A protein has these predicted regions:
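Long, terminal "pre-/pro-" and other extracytoplasmic accessory regions
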Residues: 2-8, 12, 16-158
Length: 158
């Protein structure tokens, strides 16, 4: 009888711990379909896609703003954008290359990266704002960094 009681207690303890562990995990964003979005958001997404294909849609809250992050491809290149819950386009990030950006921006990025390896280069466009250039890179120690500059090569805070 003591063995049964001990086994029962151990099972309850493990069940309780596994439940606690499950609740402690961060929630994964739910992947959505275009049809799941409010009509105003659907309209902005369709206009912004420009014939591209949606890879994924996730709802998130960033800087206190409820928004939808749309990951897409256009002509084989990554093109991601965020749309506010009210349908406003917030930002468009599109894959590009160092060779395709203004010379001053390229030079500033190359100075920052010096000795590191560029992993991605994207245009960073917010409606009504100048176009920016965002570059992700790994330094010589393998640590990941990002740099954001304007067309003149000046550092910009997002």
């Amino acid at each position: 009888m003591r063995t049964v009681t001990t086994l029962f207690a151990a099972a309850c303890l493990l069940a309780g711990l596994s439940g606690e562990y499950a609740f402690a995990q961060p929630a994964k964003p739910k992947t959505l379909q275009l049809k799941d979005l409010p009509a105003s958001v659907q309209k902005t997404v369709q206009e912004t896609l420009k014939g591209g294909a949606i890879k994924s849609i996730a709802k998130e809250k960033e800087d206190g703003i409820e928004q939808y992050e749309i990951e897409s491809t256009l002509n084989g290149n990554s093109r991601d954008f965020n749309v506010a819950a009210d349908g406003r386009l917030l930002v468009v990030e599109e894959a590009t290359t160092l060779e395709a950006i203004p010379a001053a921006a390229k030079a500033a990025i190359q100075r920052k990266v010096a000795g590191g390896t560029v992993t991605t280069v994207e245009t960073f466009a917010k409606p009504g704002k100048p176009l920016l250039y965002e570059t992700a890179y790994k330094d010589a120690q393998g640590k990941r960094h990002e740099v954001l500059v304007d067309a003149d090569g000046k550092d910009v805070k997002d």
